[in-house]
C-alpha cells in the first residue's frame, strides 16, 4: 500500500465514522452542539468529525458510543460486536 493509497483509505474510513456518528446523533435527537459540549470540543470541531475532516480520539469515541447507545466497534467498523455471557460461552465449549 502506497502512502497515497493509505491517505485515501484513511479519509474514507474517517468519513464513514463521521457519518455513523451523525446518523445516530440525529436519530437520538441530540444536537451537535450538545454532543460537542460533552466531549469538551468546539461545535465546529464536531462538524469536522461528522464530515470526515477530523479524527476523534479513542476516549472521545468511547464517550460518543456511550451517549449514542452503540459500541465503539459500530462507530469504527459499522458492525455491532456481539457479546455473550459466560454461561453461553461455557455451553458452546460443551458442544
Predicted features and spans:
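Short, charged recognition helix plus adjacent turn
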Residues: 1-7, 76-95
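A short, Lys/Arg-rich alpha-helix, primarily the initiator
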Residues: 2-27
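A composition/secondary-structure signal for short, hydrophobic, low-basic-content segments
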Residues: 10-12, 38-41, 56, 84
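Short alpha-helical elements of helix-turn-helix
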Residues: 17-19, 44, 58-61
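Short basic helix-loop element that most often maps to the first helix and adjoining turn
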Residues: 19-38, 63
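Recognition helix of helix-turn-helix/homeodomain-like DNA-binding domains
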Residues: 39-56, 77
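DNA major-groove recognition helix of helix-turn-helix/homeodomain DNA-binding modules
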Residues: 57-74
Amino acid at each position: 500500500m502506497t502512502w497515497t493509497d493509505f491517505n485515501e483509505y484513511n479519509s474514507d474510513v474517517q468519513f464513514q465514522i463521521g457519518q455513523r456518528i451523525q446518523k445516530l446523533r440525529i436519530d437520538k435527537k441530540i444536537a451537535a452542539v450538545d454532543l460537542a459540549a460533552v466531549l469538551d470540543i468546539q461545535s465546529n470541531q464536531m462538524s469536522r468529525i461528522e464530515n470526515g475532516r477530523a479524527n476523534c480520539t479513542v476516549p472521545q469515541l468511547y464517550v460518543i458510543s456511550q451517549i449514542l447507545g452503540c459500541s465503539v466497534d459500530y462507530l469504527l467498523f459499522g458492525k455491532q460486536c456481539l457479546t455473550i455471557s459466560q454461561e453461553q460461552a461455557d455451553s458452546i465449549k460443551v458442544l
